[in-house]
Amino acid sequence: MNPNQKIIAIGSASLGILILNVILHVVSIIVTVLVLNNNGTGLYCNGTIIREYNETVRVERITQWYNTNTIEYIERPSNEYYMNNTEPLCEAQGFAPFSKDNGIRIGSRGHVFVIREPFVSCSPLECRTFFLTQGSLLNDKHSNGTVKDRSPYRTFMSVKVGQSPNVYQARFEAVAWSATACHDGKKWMTVGVTGPDAQAVAVVHYGGVPVDIINSWAGDILRTQESSCTCIKGDCYWVMTDGPANRQAKYRIFKAKDGRIIGQTDINFNGGHIEECSCYPNEGKVECVCRDNWTGTNRPILVISPDLSYTVGYLCAGIPTDTPRGEDSQFTGSCTSPLGNQGYGVKGFGFRQGNDVWAGRTISRTSRLGFEIIKIRNGWTQNSKDQIRKQVIVDNLNWSGYSGSFTLPVELTKKGCLVPCFWVEMIRGKPEETTIWTSSSSIVMCGVDHKIASWSWHDGAILPFDIDKM
């Protein structure tokens, strides 16, 4: 064939292929329409895809029509039910590591907040670490002087448990230098205290929105738990203190529903002192182990009923668990009175196990060094010295700090009981070390059915930082 004939042949073949392709597409469309109509779905294929990004679940409804995707973002569905939380505590034979954030180690070269008072609380879907920032980052000039407890720069924030308190994953909760938080099964409730010492205000947030307030009633540093509050059947309970740290103060129990205060009662505790309670649900009541910052080296015990009636006293055990404290052998124990004549103190916790008690304490008697949890037979109800188990969490060569309690809800564990858990803060920097800042990291442990070996899960950051050498 001559060149013109070749061109005509190729063009004819191409035209034929094009016509065939068009016919096939038309047939495909007709068949698709007929099939979809027969199945009662019309022209659209609808599907829902759930993707998780960090701690936020994003729901996308994707509508597909031929080769076109339409993506519609819809609001995350909220939980429909309040958590029950009336189950008993599970029996714990030991405590296994749940998480460790290593915030100070990471913060030497990462964008990590300067914090104190970290604690953990759980919803039916997740556990989160809450903390009070100083409005500054580690290894930065604004970290200077962050040993101070109360300032206008302090904010209450949270991350998913195990994450460092970093800039990129932290969620703002409240402006606060004292706080508590808990989940009722539907939404998070947070209480953040801020303002001047004589006129501080606690702002109650529910689902991220401020819905109620508590003004200082004694005019002397209104403050709260620095650990998880407790929700039972949709009602949430927490304890607040207003008044001196070294003599008689005023104490109140608060009850809220959907973030709105529906009840409160004063705690009559003449001669005793209550601060920074560590509370948990147990058999339909709220049990709290608190701090006596006035005289006692034994810890106050507060048990709250749903109607806001309460019993208050001291942990009966014949072993002291506050710091500073005297020798175990010289301590007799009391269920009703403070003993030990040691001022100051540190936030701590305990768990009732029948008549027994698991109680945490620093290993050092005089400073916040080391941490152990001990089980005392009949220690909840008697002046018992019968220590039947001990597990070291931080050895006596490393700094500890505050500690507190929380529970894993049955929605998370699928058990018939509430798993007892605790966290230990590990404070670094001022006043014990040569730095310009004070911050902390934490280790979190949860109760299990087996004995767990002692070890030291200490902070491990190498100090001083670069900013401390300038």
Curated annotation (Swiss-Prot):
InterPro entries associated with the record: Glyco_hydro_34, Sialidase_sf
Involved in apical transport and lipid raft association: annotated segments: 11-32
Virion surface side: 36-470
Keyword GTP-binding included in the entry's annotation: no
Transmembrane intervals: 15-35
EC numbers on record: 3.2.1.18
Annotated glycosylation sites: N39, N46, N54, N84, N144, N293, N398
Post-translational modification: N-glycosylated.
GO MF annotation: an example: metal ion binding
Domain notes: Intact N-terminus is essential for virion morphogenesis. Possesses two apical sorting signals, one in the ectodomain, which is likely to be a glycan, and the other in the transmembrane domain. The transmembrane domain also plays a role in lipid raft association.
Subunit (UniProt): Homotetramer.
Protein name: Neuraminidase
